Amino acid sequence: MKWSILLLVGCAAAIDVPRQPYAPTGSGKKRLTFNETVVKRAISPSAISVEWISTSEDGDYVYQDQDGSLKIQSIVTNHTQTLVPADKVPEDAYSYWIHPNLSSVLWATNYTKQYRYSYFADYFIQDVQSMKLRPLAPDQSGDIQYAQWSPTGDAIAFVRDNNVFVWTNASTSQITNDGGPDLFNGVPDWIYEEEILGDRFALWFSPDGAYLAFLRFNETGVPTFTVPYYMDNEEIAPPYPRELELRYPKVSQTNPTVELNLLELRTGERTPVPIDAFDAKELIIGEVAWLTGKHDVVAVKAFNRVQDRQKVVAVDVASLRSKTISERDGTDGWLDNLLSMAYIGPIGESKEEYYIDISDQSGWAHLWLFPVAGGEPIALTKGEWEVTNILSIDKPRQLVYFLSTKHHSTERHLYSVSWKTKEITPLVDDTVPAVWSASFSSQGGYYILSYRGPDVPYQDLYAINSTAPLRTITSNAAVLNALKEYTLPNITYFELALPSGETLNVMQRLPVKFSPKKKYPVLFTPYGGPGAQEVSKAWQALDFKAYIASDPELEYITWTVDNRGTGYKGRAFRCQVASRLGELEAADQVFAAQQAAKLPYVDAQHIAIWGWSYGGYLTGKVIETDSGAFSLGVQTAPVSDWRFYDSMYTERYMKTLESNAAGYNASAIRKVAGYKNVRGGVLIQHGTGDDNVHFQNAAALVDTLVGAGVTPEKLQVQWFTDSDHGIRYHGGNVFLYRQLSKRLYEEKKRKEKGEAHQWSKKSVL
C-alpha cells in the first residue's frame, strides 16, 4: 500500500486560513447519536447566499430576514433598508426576484414540487412604493412553470401549460400555442431537466433585453414509463393507485427533438432557427449563450446523441445565418456539458471578440478563450490540474476568477487569471489543504470568501486586492462551541496506488476513541459514477457516517474511495470506464478493501459496502465479483441494468445498445454467485415512486437473485411506498437509516460459522 503524505508549507502571498487544515475531532466527551445525525442535523454549519444587486454603490444585496421582510443591505457599511415589510409579503411566498431598478418584486407563491428542479407556482408582481400586488396571470391556479425578468426590467417571460408568454406593462402576449403534454416551450422536459440543462428553464434574454431565445422540445414518439403512487399523499390509500405517465427515453429509444427559437420582443415575431450540427433525431442542445453585449449573436453548444462529438454553432440574429465556430471529437470517451460559456468581448487592441469556456481538450479541464467568429482558441490555464468553476468575470480588470484543483484533486482553491498576461494569482494560500468558494459583487469590487472545510466553515468579506477581511459574515461560532462538548471521528485523507501506477483518493473516518490495538469493522461508502467526486476536503457533515463511527455499539471505520472514472483527475482517468461501466469501478473498490484488510486495526472478516443510486449499482457490481473482500452489501435505489436507465445519461458513457451490446450485457448485474457467497448477505432498498432510477431495477434484480436460488439468509429486500429517489415519503428516510444501522450491528456481531435452519444445510437438501 502506498500512502501519500501531505506537507503543509507556509505561504504569505495570499489570504491565510484561520482554521486548522484538518477536520475537527472535538474536545469533549459526548458522542454523536442517531437523533443528532439522522433524525435532525443538530450540529450543522450555516452559510449565507446573497443576491447581489446593481445600485449606485457596489456591494449591495437583497435578502429576506427571519421575520420575512425583504431588505437591501450594503455588505460594506452594513446599512439596511426595508424593501418589503413582513406584513406586505404575500402569503405562502416561496421565492422572489427583484426588478433591475428595485421598483418591483416578482414573487412565487403556492409552490408545488415537480421533478428535481422544476415546480409549479402562482406569480405576483409587487410595486414597492404602493405595496400593491397584481397577479402575473389573472386566472393562474398554481400552474405557472417559470418566470423571469428581462435584464432591463420592462418585460417578464413566463411559461404556462408548456407555452411561452411575455408580460409587459400589465399586458400579456402568448408567444406559442402548441404547448401540451408532448411539446415543451421554454421549459425542459424530464430528461433535459435531469441530464442536460440541470435546471427548470430553457429560455434566455439577450443582454439588452431585445430578444428572447428559447428551446422547444418535442416528445412525440418518446416511450412512456408509468410510475404508480399507491398512497398519493393521502393518509388512507385510494382503491386505485394514481399513475404518472412519464415520457422517459431509455437506451436506444426515441429521444425528444429540440429546436431553437428567437423572439424579437418589440415586434413579437418568433423565428425557429435550424441547428444542423447533427441530424435532428440525434441532436442534443446542451447550452445556449448570448455571445454579445447586446443581441447580435446567440450560440448553441450541440452534441450528437452519444455525446462524444460537440459543435458550437453561432447564429447571427440579424440574418439568421449560422456557423460552426468550434468543434470537438471526444470519441475516446465522452464530452461533458459544463454550462460554462460566457461572453468576454474584444481583448486588448484587437477588435476580435471572444468568449470563455472550460474545455478538457488538453486532457485536463482548463479555461480557454474562443473567438466568437471562429478560429484557434487561446489557453488561459494549463497543467495537470483542473478548473472546476468560473466564479466571476471582471471585464474592467480583465480578470477571470475561478476554482481549481491546482494543489490537489480533493481541494478547491481560488485564483484569478488575467486574459491579458495569462498570469495566475492565488487569492488564498493554496499550499494549505482546503476547499474554498466565493461570491463577487455586481461590480466586482467585493467578494464573500467562503471557507468550506475541512474545518468548520466560515465566511469573510474582502475588497478586491486586499488580504485583510473587512469583516466576518458568518463565523459559525455556535458550531465551534457545540463541538467542544463532543468527541468526533477522526477524518484523514490519503492516496492508494493501483498496480497500474494510478492512485485513488481515499477518505478514512476512524471511530471515536480509536485504538490501534483494537480491530474494527469497516463500511465502504462509494458513489463512484463518471465524473463524480466523494473524497473532498470540504467539511464533512455530521451525518450517518459520523454516527456509525460514534455509536459505541457500532464503531465502524468508514472508507470512501474515488475509483477510476471519477472526476477532477484528468480526462484519461475519467474516460477509461467508457463503454464498460461497473468493471474498473468494482475492481478498484475490491482492491481498496483488500488493502484495508491488511491493516492491523481492521477486522478483515467484517468489511461492508453501501451505496445509493450509482453507488448502489457499484455495490452490486462489487458483490458480483465474488471476491470475498466484502462481507455485507447494501444497495439503495440501485441501477441494475443500464437498459433500464435514461438514454442521455447512459449513452454518454455506454454508447447505444446496438453498438455496444457486449458492454451492456457485461455491465448489468446478473451473476449471482457473489450474492450466494457474501457472508453477511445483501440488503436492497428502493422507493416505488422513484421517477429517476425506476423501481423496475430492484424488481428485476431481486427476481434474478431469487430465481437463481439465493437464499433468504442472504437476501433482504425493503421497498418504500411512493418514495422517490431520495426515499423520504412518510418517514422513509429515518426507517432506511435505522434498518441500515441494524444490519451493520448484526454484521459486526455475526460469527463466521453460526447456526442455521436445516434448509440451509446442504446435507439435508
From Swiss-Prot:
Record localization: Secreted
GO BP annotations, alphabetical order: proteolysis
Cellular component per GO, a single term: plasma membrane
Keyword Protease: yes
Protein name: Probable dipeptidyl peptidase 4
Record function comment: Extracellular dipeptidyl-peptidase which removes N-terminal dipeptides sequentially from polypeptides having unsubstituted N-termini provided that the penultimate residue is proline. Contributes to pathogenicity.
PANTHER family, per database record: DIPEPTIDYL PEPTIDASE 4-RELATED, PROTEASE FAMILY S9B,C DIPEPTIDYL-PEPTIDASE IV-RELATED
pH dependence per the entry: Optimum pH is 6.7 to 7.0.
SUPFAM superfamilies assigned: alpha/beta-Hydrolases, DPP6 N-terminal domain-like
Glycosylation site residues: N35, N78, N101, N110, N169, N218, N465, N490, N665
Pfam families (alphabetical): DPPIV_N, Peptidase_S9
Position of the signal peptide: 1-14
Family named by the database record: Belongs to the peptidase S9B family.
GO molecular function terms noted in the UniProt entry: aminopeptidase activity; dipeptidyl-peptidase activity; serine-type peptidase activity
The keyword Protease is annotated on this UniProt entry: yes
EC number(s) on file: 3.4.14.5
Gene from which the chain derives: dpp4
